[in-house]
């Protein structure tokens, strides 16, 4: 019987939050989109502009919009591990949980999903599931929040592999799961 020797992990990549057409933030109603490049819509969007002055004006306007947090690239929280990437644009516009950033409100007839992911990963609704059972895991143990980046070093440890050095995850963060 192989079962007593198996370590089984069930996880997901993220949680989900309910969205609604009534909770949209159409940026075009607040800023001049002609001189702004918008990449993406949903829980967040990236904005850029060739004009530094236009970028500053856009930033200052967006800071005053309810249910919206706007970050200059250098101010993006370090815990997200991506502000220094070359693909990250000048501004990150992040909606509050359940709200959606859009360029234009297309009205009630346009399609909108009833839920999404991509909000701040500190929100409970964005947390992934994590279930584990097997000879290396404590029995009936309930862990504090587990960050997905820590699962790779955990699996590498279980398989007795040396994890790649250039990762953000740490086995120490999930050591409490192990016997």
Residue map of PLM features:
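Catalytic cores of processing enzymes, dominated by hydrolases/peptidases
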Residues: 23-24, 29, 104-107
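…; additionally, a secondary subgroup of soluble metalloenzymes is captured
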Residues: 141, 150-179
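Acidic, His- and aromatic-enriched active-site or binding-groove loops in soluble protein domains
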Residues: 28-44
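Sec-exported extracytoplasmic/periplasmic mature domains
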Residues: 1-4, 63, 67, 156-164
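Short glycine-aromatic motifs
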Residues: 6, 34-37, 68
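Active-site neighborhoods of enzymes that stabilize oxyanions during catalysis
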Residues: 39-154
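Glycine-centered flexibility sites
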Residues: 14-16, 115, 134, 160
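Metal-dependent active-site segment of extracytoplasmic phospho-/sulfohydrolases and closely related
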Residues: 1-26
């Amino acid at each position: 019987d192989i079962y007593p020797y198996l370590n089984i992990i069930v996880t997901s990549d993220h949680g989900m939050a309910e969205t609604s057409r009534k909770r949209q933030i159409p940026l075009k109603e607040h800023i001049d989109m002609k001189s702004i490049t918008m990449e993406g819509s949903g829980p967040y969007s990236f904005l850029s502009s060739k004009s530094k002055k236009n970028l500053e004006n856009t930033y200052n306007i967006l800071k005053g919009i309810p249910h919206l947090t706007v970050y200059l690239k250098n101010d993006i929280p370090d815990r997200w591990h991506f502000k220094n990437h070359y693909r990250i644009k000048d501004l990150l516009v992040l909606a509050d949980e359940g709200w959606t950033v859009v360029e234009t409100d297309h009205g009630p007839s346009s399609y909108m999903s009833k839920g999404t992911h991509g909000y701040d990963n500190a929100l409970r609704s964005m947390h992934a599931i994590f279930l584990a059972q097997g000879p290396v895991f404590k029995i009936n143990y309930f862990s504090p929040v587990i960050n997905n980046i820590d699962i790779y070093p955990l699996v590498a440890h279980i398989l007795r592999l040396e994890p790649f050095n250039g990762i953000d995850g740490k086995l120490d963060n999930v050591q409490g799961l192990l016997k």
